[in-house]
């Protein structure tokens, strides 16, 4: 299982939100580059970065920070948030990003998504964020009438190989992942699944590992120290 420490960017700082609410933010580190280096130092093999400002604005607003992170660490970095054109995708790859996560575009701009997948294959990940089972977009501000399962099936048909699934109600809560939704998703598609939202303990990670989930994104639990990064990396290596 792959472990992805999370860095959420807002106004150039590393923050955490509670249930996706932009008004409920906590600054975890004023220096995201330093935070990335800390994660790498403690053994992280890859990083997950979200440009929260970009997710709302529809364009990357923290590109310079992302570039500095990519230059500061030697591990692969995947980035999502506000990526809605091929130019934006190419710009991220040009500054050293390993994989790009498309969210809103997956729902509203299928031609762009199809072209991106055609050009970059497994380098394109789709992020599906759900609220009460329905897909949320534009920085989680809009909730659609499309179920997360239906969108996942569409993505698989297009050729998407990896999906990041987030249950928004769990994000930043340390309440544990939504196992039921993940199980249903697993039964519905054969893509790789990366679970995000609510991961609070080593036990949560073990449970997801037992389900053969490909990867887990861990944010608040690392900052609040309810999960030790070195320990979780060791545990998943032994599983």
UniProtKB/Swiss-Prot annotation:
Keyword Hydrolase annotated: no
Active-site feature positions: 8 (proton acceptor), 129 (proton donor)
EC nos: 5.3.1.16
Gene Ontology BP terms: L-histidine biosynthetic process; L-tryptophan biosynthetic process
Subcellular localization(s) per the UniProt record: Cytoplasm
Any GO molecular function: 1-(5-phosphoribosyl)-5-[(5-phosphoribosylamino)methylideneamino]imidazole-4-carboxamide isomerase activity
Gene Ontology CC: one annotated term: cytoplasm
InterPro entries to which the protein is assigned, alphabetical: Aldolase_TIM (IPR013785), His_biosynth (IPR006062), HisA_bact_arch (IPR006063), Isoase_HisA-like (IPR044524), Isoase_HisA-like_bact (IPR023016), RibuloseP-bd_barrel (IPR011060)
UniProt main location, coarse: cytoplasm
Catalytic activity: 1-(5-phospho-beta-D-ribosyl)-5-[(5-phospho-beta-D-ribosylamino)methylideneamino]imidazole-4-carboxamide = 5-[(5-phospho-1-deoxy-D-ribulos-1-ylimino)methylamino]-1-(5-phospho-beta-D-ribosyl)imidazole-4-carboxamide
Domain of life: Bacteria
NCBIfam families linked: 1-(5-phosphoribosyl)-5-[(5-phosphoribosylamino)methylideneamino]imidazole-4-carboxamide isomerase
PANTHER family: 1-(5-PHOSPHORIBOSYL)-5-[(5-PHOSPHORIBOSYLAMINO)METHYLIDENEAMINO] IMIDAZOLE-4-CARBOXAMIDE ISOMERASE
Record protein name field: 1-(5-phosphoribosyl)-5-[(5-phosphoribosylamino)methylideneamino] imidazole-4-carboxamide isomerase
Species in which this protein is naturally found: Bacillus cereus (strain ATCC 10987 / NRS 248)
Species lineage: Bacteria, Bacillati, Bacillota, Bacilli, Bacillales
